[in-house]
A protein has these predicted regions:
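Helical "lid/coupling" subdomains associated with nucleotide-phosphate turnover
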Residues: 92-110, 114, 120, 137-139, ...
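Glycine-rich beta-strand-to-loop/alpha-helix junction loops that act as flexible
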Residues: 129-135, 194-199, 279-286
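Conserved phosphate-binding loops in N-terminal lobes of ATP-dependent enzymes
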Residues: 47-154
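Gly/Thr-rich phosphate-binding beta-strand-loop-beta motif of the actin/hexokinase/Hsp70
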Residues: 44-75, 178-212, 284
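Bacterial N-terminal signal peptides
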Residues: 20-32
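N-terminal secretory signal peptides that target proteins for export/translocation
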Residues: 1-16
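Bacterial Sec-dependent signal peptides at the C-terminal "C-region" and cleavage site
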Residues: 31-42
Length: 398
């Protein structure tokens, strides 16, 4: 990817999903959970069950393990393990899938499955396996059969609307404190996910009716253009063997015009997307931007600003190495510095310089079109797990 020694690693129609309040309340508790690595524990007076979830997307394999303690009152859910195994499962610059794509995916899923069963003792019947909608729309022909032969698991793809709904519930905190007062955060926030092959967004609205019980509307947007697919589009436009300078000039000249137009068309039917007070960013691009800008910030929600996004777009276009290969000795804590260095290495293995440049332009265009100048913007570090977390949680409480 970068020249350093590293390890390799049609627009949708407007859609609104209306859910009964009872179903949505099950989703509302998700963000109170903390995912990480921990040993299962058995609280006094309770029985414990273990569940696992695996999600396959163009960006990789996301895996979680949950411990459910059945008490007299209600189930208590605790995250005991989470991991992101990054892969490149999308089409390459020539429009074809890498020949080893299905094999790599099956190996990663097999690794996740083994870890859930052997290390965390999750029974096979309590492990749920889903595929992201973008991968479902465009994937290698043999992907499902190769995974099934290697793991015994059947891949069930989500549709885009359901995926966005689950991601919103699993990523955006239910409440938010403003001047010491708790407010309904999901009714004033939006989720934006920049994927490799698509860009998704969504938000929640509580609607009241004099004829029926309250219901939530999950408004979803999905544009079939992501960081890698846009970079491939630019590469084809400038021609094979073109220089990084030519690529960057094309990105800046076109300013992601096709993506901008698709976004504007979506906003015609979803104008409220511009009026959310807070924005939560997820996906590999958001992770790379937040890490390269603020490597020392390791909290769950990393704040970034509109100006950060504008400046990142210019800096990464001017010299990708300036950010991706920066000196990290200013981080005094050695353990933290090592963790950050591993993240930087992972970023360089995940993205080519051209892809970071293209992705930064897409992020800039989104910030401009959605008018983020006065918004609160956050990179949601655990947002990549939001969908599979919500999906597994709903299976548990059924």
């Amino acid at each position: 990817m970068f020249s350093s020694k590293i390890r390799s690693g049609a627009e949708c129609a407007p859609k609104v999903l209306t859910l009964p309040l009872s179903v949505c309340l099950l989703l509302c508790v998700l963000c109170a959970m903390t995912l990480g690595q921990a040993s299962p524990s058995n609280p006094p007076g309770s029985s414990v069950e273990l569940y696992g979830g695996i999600e396959l997307s163009n960006e990789g394999v996301k895996v979680i393990a949950l411990q459910v303690s059945q008490t007299d009152d209600e189930p208590s859910i605790k995250g005991i393990y989470s991991e992101m195994i990054r892969l490149r499962l999308g089409r390459a610059n020539d429009g074809e899938f890498p020949p080893q794509a299905s094999t790599d995916a099956a190996q990663a899923v097999s690794t996740a499955l083994s870890r859930l069963q052997q290390q965390y003792k999750v029974p096979p019947e309590r492990i749920y396996f889903i595929g992201a909608s973008g991968l479902g729309a465009d994937h290698p022909k043999d992907l499902e059969s190769v995974i099934r032969d290697a793991t015994g698991l059947t891949l069930n793809f989500l549709d885009a609307v359901t995926e966005v709904q689950l991601s919103v519930a699993g990523t955006i905190p239910r409440t938010w404190k403003v001047a010491g007062v708790s407010t309904d955060n999901r009714n004033t926030s939006a989720l934006i996910h920049f994927g490799n092959a698509s860009t998704q967004a969504g938000y929640e609205m509580l609607k009241y009716s004099s004829f029926d019980s309250p219901a939530f509307d999950f408004v979803a947007m999905s544009i079939p253009q992501g960081v890698i697919s846009y970079a491939n589009e630019v590469s084809r436009a400038v021609g094979a063997g073109s220089t990084l300078f030519s690529f960057t000039r094309q990105v800046k000249t076109s300013s992601a015009s096709s993506f901008r137009q698709a976004l504007r068309k979506e906003l015609e039917s979803k104008p409220n997307l511009m009026h959310r007070k807070r924005v939560f960013l997820t996906g590999n691009l958001a992770w790379a931007v937040a890490t390269l800008l603020y490597p020392q910030y390791r909290q769950t929600l990393v704040p970034i600003t509109y100006d950060d996004i504008m400046q990142f777009s210019e800096r990464i276009a001017r010299d990708p190495k300036e950010l991706a290969l920066r000196n990290l000795t200013f981080i005094r804590d050695r353990k933290l510095r090592k963790e950050v260095e591993q993240d930087f290495e992972a970023i360089r293995a995940t993205f080519k310089p051209q892809e970071l440049i293209a992705g930064a332009e897409m992020l800039k265009v989104t910030a401009e079109e959605l008018k983020w100048q006065n918004k609160e913007i956050f990179f949601a570090r655990l947002g990549q797990l939001g969908c599979i977390l919500s999906y597994t949680r709903l299976k548990i409480v059924k």
